[in-house]
Each structure stands twice: as structure tokens, then as C-alpha cells.
């Protein structure tokens, strides 16, 4: 029984003839039509087209999807006639094909692919031309192949690689910003705690150095009302009656009221 990857490997072996008949291509000389195995790639294209129309607001959406489903059914029948088994059209998609081995031993059954797995550039040679829901095909060619190779094509339906990397950079900046704020706040708290501990130690040290400690001449704390007591004569000089305040603060009365 044939698996999807078996079908893909067979199709890759014939992929150099999928553009035939075309007199401009040397390999198409004498070829009157493309091999039926090429239906795999046509079916994968239809699956991408179906996905795009599925999420569009175009008034012709229903009509277009109906036609696409008919075309998908034709390709599925073609593959069934070749391999004698009915493959689910949902299994024949670019992102699933990417995971298939071209050749289990050499990695290049068709002779034109050098990688063990089908990479993004390989799929493009087979007809893969994505248009994402977000970003479309914007800046697809702006990214080097080394970068594109690291991004699975499964994301292409939703967000193109250039936009994805842009969003990842923004996300990374946000994460680094949050990390910076957390570290800064933590360091500030530690610094304040350290200063507080130093003030306590300094206070204890100063108190221990008091020559009159534990004697009848031990220093007493400053009067908490000292500032108010100093301000009262100032207000009295301006003509205010401060008798009640003098009484509350334990100051001697003055006949100024």
C-alpha cells in the first residue's frame, strides 16, 4: 500500500517532466504530455488555493470553492488509477510533502534535489508559490535562502516568513524590555534594602559609641516638638495668639493675647 510520501517520491522522480510538453525545455523533447504523477503537485496547489478562497469575502466564494473541489476530485482519481489506492486529498499538501524523504537511501531520487528532505527551495521548483493570508507574498524574496530554509512552509498559509520574522523581532524586543524592567526594579529594591540596613547599622554603631550610654548622663532623644516650639515665638511676633499651643506643648504662658 502506498503512503503519501511514496507518492511524493515517485512524483519527484518525474518532476523534471511536469512542465512538458514544452519545446523550450531539452528534457521535454519527444514528450507529448506531463506524467500523471505530476497530479500530486497540481493537487497541492489546489489545496492552497482552496484555503485562500475559504477565508475570503468574495461573493464568488461558493462558486469558486465548488470548482476547486471538482478539480481536486479529478486529481485524486488520477492518483488512484496510478497507485490503486485512494489517497485523502487533505494529505497531499505542501507542508506535509515537505516532511517526506525524496529517497530513503540517497536523498535524491529524482536526481535534481540535493537535500534529504524537500526544502522550501525544492518545493518552489515543483510549483510551490505561496500567498499568505497576512502579508501576502510581500518581501518573500527579501529573505536569504538560509533564513527561509529554517522556516517550515506550514506557516506560509497564515503569515509569510518576512512578516513572521518581523513579529518575532518585535516579540523579542518586548521580552527583553520586560526582562530589563524586572532586573532594574529588583536591583533598585536590593539597593534600597542595602541602604536601609547600612543606616540601621550606623545608628546602632553611633549609639554604642555614646560615652554616656547606660549612665545617668545617657543622651536623651531630641524633643519631637522642638520645631513647633521655635515657630511659636515667630507667630507671636506677627500678632497671633498662641496661648493654646503653648499650653499643649508645655511652654510657659506669655501675656500676648
From Swiss-Prot:
UniProt keywords, alphabetically: Host membrane, Late protein, Membrane, Transmembrane, Transmembrane helix, Virion
Does the keyword section mention rRNA processing?
Answer: no
**What is the recorded membrane topology of this protein?**
Multi-pass membrane protein
Q: Which residues cross the membrane?
A: 123-143, 163-183
Report the induction information: Expressed in the late phase of the viral replicative cycle.
Q: Which domain of life is it from?
A: Viruses
- The organism named in the record is African swine fever virus (isolate Tick/Malawi/Lil 20-1/1983) (ASFV)
Primary location class: host cell
Compartments reported by the entry: Host membrane; Virion
Q: Which family does the record assign?
A: Belongs to the asfivirus C257R family.
GO CC term, one of those recorded: host cell membrane
In its UniProt entry, what is this protein called? Answer: Transmembrane protein C257L
Amino acid at each position: 500500500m502506498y503512503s503519501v510520501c511514496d507518492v511524493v517520491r515517485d512524483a519527484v522522480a518525474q518532476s523534471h517532466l511536469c512542465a512538458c510538453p514544452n519545446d523550450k525545455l531539452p528534457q521535454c523533447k519527444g514528450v507529448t504530455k506531463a506524467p500523471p504523477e505530476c497530479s500530486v503537485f497540481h493537487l497541492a496547489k489546489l489545496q492552497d488555493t482552496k484555503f485562500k478562497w475559504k477565508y475570503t469575502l468574495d461573493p464568488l466564494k461558493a462558486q469558486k470553492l465548488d470548482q476547486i473541489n471538482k478539480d481536486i476530485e479529478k486529481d485524486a482519481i488520477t492518483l488512484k488509477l496510478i497507485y490503486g489506492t485512494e489517497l485523502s486529498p487533505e494529505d497531499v499538501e505542501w507542508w506535509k510533502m515537505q516532511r517526506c524523504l525524496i529517497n530513503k537511501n540517497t536523498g535524491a531520487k529524482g536526481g535534481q534535489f540535493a537535500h534529504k528532505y524537500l526544502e522550501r527551495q525544492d518545493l518552489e521548483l515543483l510549483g510551490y508559490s505561496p500567498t499568505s493570508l497576512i502579508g501576502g507574498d510581500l518581501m518573500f524574496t527579501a529573505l536569504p535562502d538560509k533564513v527561509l530554509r529554517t522556516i517550515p512552509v506550514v506557516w506560509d498559509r497564515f503569515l509569510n516568513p518576512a512578516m513572521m520574522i518581523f513579529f518575532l523581532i518585535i516579540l523579542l524586543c518586548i521580552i527583553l524590555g520586560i526582562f530589563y524592567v524586572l532586573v532594574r526594579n529588583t536591583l533598585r529594591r536590593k539597593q534600597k534594602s542595602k541602604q536601609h540596613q547600612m543606616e540601621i547599622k550606623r545608628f546602632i554603631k553611633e549609639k554604642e559609641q555614646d560615652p554616656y550610654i547606660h549612665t545617668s548622663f545617657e543622651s536623651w532623644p531630641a524633643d519631637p516638638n522642638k520645631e513647633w516650639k521655635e515657630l511659636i515665638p515667630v507667630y507671636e511676633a506677627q500678632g497671633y495668639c498662641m496661648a493654646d499651643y503653648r499650653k499643649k506643648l508645655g511652654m510657659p504662658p506669655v501675656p500676648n493675647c
